[in-house]
């Protein structure tokens, strides 16, 4: 899937989304030394094509907070992909 990279999640059109979620990853495959925030549609359990790339975890969290929608961060569960840091709902 070709990704659309935005500066923050406040730039996203959420119309048509039922349960937007953001997942923060640390150094996922192909993106070294970065945090990547991927926007997911929680109602389908599938990622969208939207992502934000930042240098720090703090910047990743700020990019999510600018959405004005997701304000609850949940730490990675033991069964999650090791690259996942947090999920925001």
Each predicted region: which residue ranges?
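A short, exposed loop/beta-hairpin motif centered on an aromatic-Gly-Thr core
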Residues: 45-57
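Short, mixed-charge low-complexity intrinsically disordered segments
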Residues: 71-89
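Secondary-structure transition/turn motif
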Residues: 38-42, 88-89
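Glycine-rich loops and low-complexity Gly/Arg-rich segments
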Residues: 47-49, 61-64, 76-78
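Short C-terminal domain-edge/linker segments immediately following a structured domain
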Residues: 55-58, 66-70
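Low-complexity, compositionally biased segments
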Residues: 16, 30, 52, 83-84
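Short N-terminal "domain-start" leader segments
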Residues: 1-36, 43, 65-69, 75
């Amino acid at each position: 899937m070709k990704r659309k990279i935005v500066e923050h999640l406040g730039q996203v059109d959420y119309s048509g989304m039922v349960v937007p979620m953001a997942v923060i990853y640390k150094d996922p495959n192909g993106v070294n030394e970065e945090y990547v925030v991927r926007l997911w549609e929680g109602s389908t359990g599938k990622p969208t094509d939207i992502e934000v790339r930042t240098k720090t975890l703090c910047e990743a969290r700020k990019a999510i907070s600018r959405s004005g929608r997701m304000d609850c961060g949940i730490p990675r569960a033991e069964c999650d992909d090791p690259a996942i840091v947090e999920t925001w709902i």
